[in-house]
Each structure stands twice: as C-alpha cells, then as structure tokens.
Amino acid sequence: MKPTEIKKPYRMEEFLRPQMFQEVAQMVHFQWRRNPVDNSMVNASMVPFCLSAFLNVLFFGCNGWDIIGHFWLGHPANQNPPVLSITIYFSIRGLMLYLKRKEIVEFVNDLDRECPRDLVSQLDMQMDETYRNFWQRYRFIRIYSHLGGPMFCVVPLALFLLTHEGKDTPVAQHEQLLGGWLPCGVRKDPNFYLLVWSFDLMCTTCGVSFFVTFDNLFNVMQGHLVMHLGHLARQFSAIDPRQSLTDEKRFFVDLRLLVQRQQLLNGLCRKYNDIFKVAFLVSNFVGAGSLCFYLFMLSETSDVLIIAQYILPTLVLVGFTFEICLRGTQLEKASEGLESSLRSQEWYLGSRRYRKFYLLWTQYCQRTQQLGAFGLIQVNMVHFTEIMQLAYRLFTFLKSH
C-alpha cells in the first residue's frame, strides 16, 4: 500500500516487510505470519538464522584461528581490519536478534494489539504519517542496499579480473571481498578465487541482512511508540478540567483510562529499551572502532576504486549511528510531550479532587522515557557526538603510530 493510497486499514505486516535482496538470498530472519488460531504474529521459520549461524561460525572460526596464530606463533596476519570490524558490528546485531527473538515477537504482538483496526481510528492516531515515514525510509534503504551493496561486492572482483598478474601470483588483500584466512591457502589461490568470492558474498549478504533487519525493527517499533505517545498527548490536551465540576464520576472514569494507557505505553517503552540495550552498549563502540579503521583506510590510499568501495560502509556507519541517536531523542521528546500537554491545562479550574490528582499526575509524567544501556549511556544526540569523538581519537592514535 502506497502512503498516498489510503483505501484500507494498515496492517502490522506492512511495516515489517523485508527487502528484495533478503527474499532472493533466503535471508529473511523474521518471516512474519498470522497464527490462524489467535491471529497473532509469529516467526514462521528459523532456517535463515541457522544458515547465518553456520556462515558466522565458519567465518569467525577461521579468522579467530588466524588471529591466534598471529599473536602466539608470529604468523603473518591476513586480516583486513576495516572489514573485520564491520563484520563484527553486523554480527553483534544478528546475535542480538537471535537471542531476543522471542521478546521481539512478543513486542511486535503488543504493538499489533494496540493498533486500531479501522481506518478512521488509524487516521485519528496519525498512522498514515507513521506509515509515510516508514515508506520513505524503506525506499531509501532499498535503493542504497541494492545499488551500494552490489558495488561493494563487485569492486574486488573487478580488480582481480583486470589487474591480477597470473595464476602463480597469490591473490592480494585488496582483490578479496572480505579478506582473512581460510584453510589450505584457498583464499590466496587464484584457482579458487570465484569459490572464495562466493563464500564472502554469502557472508556479506548475511551481515547486511542482519543490519537491515535490526534497523527496520528498531525504527518501526520506535515509530509506533512515538505515534501512540503523540496520540495520548493530544488526548491529554483535550481534557477539560471544568467537567470534573459537573460530572466528577464520569470524568474520573475517562481519566483512569488515559492513565492506564500511559502506564501501558511506559511499560512498552521499557520493554523496547530492554530488547536493544545490549546492542546499544556493544555495537556503538564497535561501530566507533569500525569508523576509525575506515577513515584510516581512506586516508592511506589514493586508489579510486578502493576509495569508492570503502566510502559506502563509512557513510552507512555515520548515517545509521546518527539515526539511532536521533530516534532516541525523538522518543524522549514524545515522552516529554505528555508532561507539556498536562502543563498547558487550566487545571486550577477543576474540582478539588482533580487538582490533587493533577499534582501527582504531573510528577509521574516527569519520568520521561529514554533509551540507554545499564545507566552507562543514553542514546541521544549527545551520545552521537561522543561516538564521533571516540572514532576521531582512535583515528588520530592510529595516524600517530
């Protein structure tokens, strides 16, 4: 359904659609289906997770063995630090998706239950705007992944086909897609180049699919929470305290429903943060390290093809780190909007009972919902500047040594 063609109510599945490359590669880690018994959302298959686990164990097992051999036995290192760091970054997010898969399915069902089923109520909640934002972002990710991804994968292949000097010459690191180490020297053997490149392509597709799935779930969940908080804030603004003087019993019945909904949304915000907090803590700092390596690589080369290959993941790291921090700020502001709506009321015109309740309610609303990780970080724009500063410090350290 296009955002300009509002003909029927939106369904949760429309926000959770995978990208085309994920479907072609059979890397849709959450295959959302409706349970015919209770109409709940379920993940129909675990096969993509199993395939991804096999690829990750093989890739990191081989590279881990090579790293151990380098530090303990003094063997030459075969790693490509920028690529290895971003594969770790993607795989951490994939591991989080697997470990939190039950919580993710449960949370999606929580959001699905809160979404109204009729179009009029959805428009009142401004779900059309939420879907429009999702659709614009989905198209951007589709263009970027289906153009930038193939370019990143094809550049090493083109370098090998155009510049490799012969079958007796080992494959150089810049001619490999991911680099690293594989048994029996097959990674550096030109006779096995296409086989190794195909394996790297599968690992790359797996990692990008992890990243896209994580990104879409994070943003869809955040968009729905902001939508619900905004709708509740408008309901707060519509409260007329003077009605507590005419029909106090009915007034407090309606008020109780609003407070219960606020408590429900606060609980959903906490569950949302619990799902992603470990990924925030680990992957953001790994992302800073990855960004440092990419900046170092770009500053040390003058090859146009290599610059073109590595500029894309650099922009991805900066852009998506910025967006995650921006989403945290947006959620915090949406939560603060509840308190702002209350403070704009003419509460002093209400009954004595309401005035007492209003003071307690205002104190409760001051507890804004924030994204963070174990009290160590707060995911907002300040955190984005901290990550960029950390990446710059690491970059200057590498340049000085």
From Swiss-Prot:
Extracellular side: 48-52, 164-191, 299-303, 392-401
Compartment list: Cell membrane
Cytoplasmic side of membrane: 1-26, 74-142, 213-277, 325-370
Alphabetized UniProt keyword annotations: Cell membrane, Membrane, Olfaction, Receptor, Sensory transduction, Transducer, Transmembrane, Transmembrane helix
Domain of life per record: Eukaryota
A Pfam cross-reference name: 7tm_6
Molecular function via GO: ionotropic olfactory receptor activity; odorant binding; olfactory receptor activity
One GO biological process term: detection of chemical stimulus involved in sensory perception of smell
Entry-linked InterPro entries: 7tm6_olfct_rcpt
GO cellular component, one term: plasma membrane
Main localization, broad class: membrane
Spans traversing the lipid bilayer: 27-47, 53-73, 143-163, 192-212, 278-298, 304-324, 371-391
Other observations noted: The atypical heteromeric and topological design of the odorant receptors appears to be an insect-specific solution for odor recognition, making the OR/Orco complex an attractive target for the development of highly selective insect repellents to disrupt olfactory-mediated host-seeking behaviors of insect disease vectors. Odor-evoked OR currents are independent of known G-protein-coupled second messenger pathways.
Physiological role: Odorant receptor which mediates acceptance or avoidance behavior, depending on its substrates. The odorant receptor repertoire encodes a large collection of odor stimuli that vary widely in identity, intensity, and duration. May form a complex with Orco to form odorant-sensing units, providing sensitive and prolonged odorant signaling and calcium permeability.
Family indicated by similarity: Belongs to the insect chemoreceptor superfamily. Heteromeric odorant receptor channel (TC 1.A.69) family. Or49a subfamily.
Subunit annotation: Interacts with Orco. Complexes exist early in the endomembrane system in olfactory sensory neurons (OSNs), coupling these complexes to the conserved ciliary trafficking pathway.
Name of the featured protein: Odorant receptor 88a
Source organism of this protein record: Drosophila melanogaster
